[in-house]
Amino acid sequence: MELIFLGTSAGVPTRTRNVTAILLNLQHPTQSGLWLFDCGEGTQHQLLHTAFNPGKLDKIFISHLHGDHLFGLPGLLCSRSMSGIIQPLTIYGPQGIREFVETALRISGSWTDYPLEIVEIGAGEILDDGLRKVTAYPLEHPLECYGYRIEEHDKPGALNAQALKAAGVPPGPLFQELKAGKTITLEDGRQINGADYLAAPVPGKALAIFGDTGPCDAALDLAKGVDVMVHEATLDITMEAKANSRGHSSTRQAATLAREAGVGMLIITHVSSRYDDKGCQHLLRECRSIFPATELANDFTVFNV
């Protein structure tokens, strides 16, 4: 999987940072996909600066209905239609997302020429496409807000081809059945169980993308053991009380959660517009003093998961 940050500013855009939007390129050889997490104002313009076509988008996940995470959605939906894109699109989001989209389209005289499904979610598993699942966790924010945990299913271990050949199994279609863990019967009547010739399963990758949040009970479950955790660091340690009063987190809180959850990497985003480049490096240093494996997302930064 590959993360591409389209917007990394909190609340309002700056000269160098747009408001929140994150692309997830699934990069699967047989079931690829492009997912978008949040869609702040100007997201479709940011998308033009990447190699990705809006027609490849098949799912959009909205964390909550504050404008800096949402106001780019109607324009993106309409432009997608005006470009002749007919591929279906599904939007997941909290209660009210359907009314927002339908109202924006209706009062502007707009429509989509592609199938559009809107799913209003609650806490719990919201998607399993056979290769990965997505679970929504409730966060601490003035509006109903969710974080999303994306988990790949474990992949089958490598097939021991040499041992199979030694057992008299010819390479070819039978190998595919054995790779799937099935039992086959050879011409001489012997039964070969594929599970006996498979290495241990390869654990799938896991990713946690937080919406806006202050410290909350669900955060640890959302982030526990993931390879990459994306979390806001809106304000520095000295302004922690202010951040929490508005349903946001400080650098210290983001980094402490990453350490307690045992994540592989913390990526901080959603930084206040009060911080210039020097200030953002200060936020990064504060996080790294607690959790060294921290990176700062800038607009168009790409991370591999």
UniProtKB/Swiss-Prot annotation:
Organism of origin: Escherichia coli O139:H28 (strain E24377A / ETEC)
Keyword DNA-binding found: no
InterPro entries: Metallo-B-lactamas, RibonucZ/Hydroxyglut_hydro, Rnase_BN, RNase_Z/BN
Note accompanying the cofactor annotation: Binds 2 Zn(2+) ions.
One of the record's GO molecular function terms: 3'-tRNA processing endoribonuclease activity
Assembly and oligomerization: Homodimer.
Residues given in the record as Zn(2+) 1 binding sites: 64, 66, 141, 212
Top-rank taxon: Bacteria
Binding site residues for Zn(2+) 2: 68-69, 212, 270
Pfam families found in the cross-reference section: Lactamase_B_2 (PF12706)
Known role: Zinc phosphodiesterase, which has both exoribonuclease and endoribonuclease activities.
Keyword tags: Endonuclease, Exonuclease, Hydrolase, Metal-binding, Nuclease, tRNA processing, Zinc
HAMAP family (UniProt xref): RNase_Z_BN
Required co-factors: Zn(2+)
Keyword Hydrolase: yes
Protein's name according to its UniProt entry: Ribonuclease BN
Active site: 68
The EC number(s) this enzyme carries: 3.1.-.-
Family, similarity comment: Belongs to the RNase Z family. RNase BN subfamily.
